[in-house]
Amino acid sequence: MAYDFSVSGQHYLFNVQTFAHTVLALGGDSYNYAFRDRTTQGVIDDVASGESELGVVFETSATAADLDAAFDAAGLEFVQLAESAPRVALPASHPLVNASSLTLEQLADYPYIYFDQGKDAPAAFFEEALGDQPCAKSIATTDRASLSELIVALNGYTVTSGILVGISDGAQLRTVPLDADVTLRLGYLKKKGAQPDGTAARFVATLEKNLERYAKF
């Protein structure tokens, strides 16, 4: 099925909210859009093939070189819109939830929940900052709802983008700054030389506004 506008993105709530804001702002009696949660490779593939016009992703100061090379090889370019610092998402009842900041060492005894990228995915493709660090307890999942439920049920944690819109997930989760020397760069993928227009341009403008509003350091 052909869509009037389609976006693919990593598993972030600010993607969903930006898409919803765009649809509401445009209105109309009829429309045919698509929003796709994907792995990092899935986002790349969707934009490269034209399945989606844009792909919302992030890279870090540590992964930028590898990701930019992968984007370039696929005929894509990354447009940075904002920067943020990583934060740890924990259950509201977690014993470390009131810390002023946390290190990965302090979290070593707790299950680490993350998004599965596939067994052959490069470390740079993880959706969590410092996702390549070894953990004694880790669980991979493929959707946002399962990730949130597992964090709460197992008293676990994940590392978020630092964009706090929607992260509370019904007040079950809280975030604490992660003590790490890494910066997150958030933006979108497009085909080289392409310029978003129409609905895509509205989406990008709304995305930039949301990122600037909710980014935390």
Put a short name on every predicted segment:
Residues 2-65:
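Central regulatory/effector-binding core of bacterial HTH transcription factors
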Residues 5-11, 111-117, 190:
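Short beta-strand->loop
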Residues 15-21, 64, 108-132:
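Secondary-structure junction motif
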Residues 26, 174-217:
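A late-sequence structural motif
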Residues 39, 48-53, 58, 118-174:
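Hydrophobic hinge/microswitch elements
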Residues 44, 48, 78, 104, ...:
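Short hydrophobic/charged patches on amphipathic alpha-helices used for structural packing
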Residues 71-73, 77-86, 90-112:
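Flexible hinge/capping segments at coil-to-helix
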Residues 73-79, 84, 149-194:
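Beta-alpha-beta core module
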